[in-house]
Amino acid sequence: MNIKLLPEVGDLVVVKITEVKNFGANGILEEYPGVEGYIHISEVATGWVKHIRSYLREGQRVVCKVINVNQERKNVDLSLKRVNQHQSREKIAEWKNEQKADKLFEIVCSKLNKDLEACKKEFGVRLVELYGTLFAAFESAAAAEGEWLPDINGDWKDTFVEVAKENITIPEVSVAGYFEAYSLASDGVEKIKEVLTIPPEIGKAELEYVGAPRYRIVVRDKDYKKAEETLKKIVQSVTDKAKKLQVELEFSRQ
């Protein structure tokens, strides 16, 4: 769902080529209905372009950078050469995610027995303003463990979360590090075991014995910041116990 009528200079856009001429190519902007774009041959590739059809063809989708916007005519000038492969891949992935989000939004509207435009006005536009993209809103709803958006009221929220959790898979991230624990006490092995025992109320983590005196710890979560916070709490807890039990301890990030 795009709430802007026109892109801005510097934006990356997905363009479907509709016509290729000797000195340029025309295309439609997939994310902006009714908006056309033009790529001059000088903006197709770095260096001299002898045959433009070696780079562009009708029906092809490319990612371009907006270099000029004509508000009155609703058309834009575009550059293909100013977009690198990494930017192109990311933009295409983002566009496909938004297409998926639009379909999920239609499902939400259908379940609510409401018109698509009515849903956009009621909560769609607000979610895009809040999260930047509709897909990001669905990701947030899918990852929610408690009440989602507690400061916002609406009978649509439960349905939105339901559709999100059924259709969006949140990939896990992991943060890891190494503990090195030493003790010369007669019961040193038991002390080290106690030091490296992680209280469940702090968080879940995987502890793996690598080889004396190293232990690898991994924290997984769908939220990177939460994973970092959990690891930080675990390290603090283990460090405090090590001091109390007189176990020498070192921690390093992987």
From Swiss-Prot:
HAMAP family: eIF_2_alpha (MF_00231). Heterotrimer composed of an alpha, a beta and a gamma chain. GO terms for molecular function: ribosome binding; RNA binding; translation initiation factor activity. Coiled coil: none annotated. PROSITE patterns: S1 (PS50126). InterPro entries: NA-bd_OB-fold, S1_domain, S1_IF2_alpha, TIF2_asu_arc, TIF2_asu_C, TIF2_asu_middle_sf, TIF_2_asu. Belongs to the eIF-2-alpha family. This is Translation initiation factor 2 subunit alpha. The gene is eif2a.
